[in-house]
Amino acid sequence: FCLSRGLGDVYKRQEYGVGIFEAFPTKSALKKALKKGYIKVDGVIASTATLISGGEQISLDIPLETTTKRSFALPLNVLFEDDYLAVIHKPAGIEVSGNKFKTLANALPRNLEPSSLYDATIPQPVHRLDYATTGIVLVGKTASSIRALNKLFEEKKIDKTYYAITIGTMKRNGRIETAIDGKPAQSDYEVMKSVPSDRFGFLNLVNLHPKTGKRHQLRKHLFSIGHPILGDKDYALDGLILKGKGLYLHAYSLEFEHPFTKNPLHITDGLPEKFGKIFHGKGV
């Protein structure tokens, strides 16, 4: 639904709606509730086109059966957890969320302790990793925490570090600013180690800091400078695709200020074993 005064743009209208109902901490969740007819204005089912100007009675009615949700039995490594948020390890070969049952999001209730806070909700990831990418994922456990963590990402107050193994002879460090889908994007990199490879010339362990958050940003950026990530089937050079061993891209750490306790958090998720094998004489 929309305000007819005061908040002129769509983004602010959606933010207003999210602020009303703590059961729906994100704009996408609010839209789903509207589509399912859970929200009424003055007793009439609302839609995204419903206008409000002040003084209306807005109500939420969720059928009881929709509050229960099957959880996916996938054991997860929990790296950090409190009543507000959690940080978990995402294995390769699973979606973070989406319209499937076997997702990381659906496995969270079995792996996390229920929050004792008043606005506790079903745990939700607040960002995504690609299907083949491993590593660290941040999760909100309360409605207010999910909103606060989303805001930290929007304001670029969460520092993300990735590691990848790339192909070819690279400069020691650099900044990639190739636009993605016509929009500015920036990634900083530093080569930590390099080893010769009969098939690939050189393989490099690269530390990566994405400064923007575009879809497939690191994969596209490294491909754009001629040094694709090992195992990447979508962004690869002819004849240099490694099959059967997955994508060598790992979300290594997150650093940010806890939005409620204000404690600094720096949480890491160690490199997969397959990364180390390349640099200890076993190759690929």
Task: Please give the residue ranges for each predicted region.
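Pseudouridine synthases involved in rRNA/tRNA modification
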Residues: 5-32, 190-203, 221-284
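RNA pseudouridine synthases
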Residues: 5-186, 274-279
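Residue-level recognition of short loop/turn positions
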Residues: 36, 42, 212, 260-261
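Short beta-strand segments enriched for Tyr within beta-sheet-rich domains
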Residues: 149, 204, 214-222
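A generic structural motif
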Residues: 167, 209, 257-259
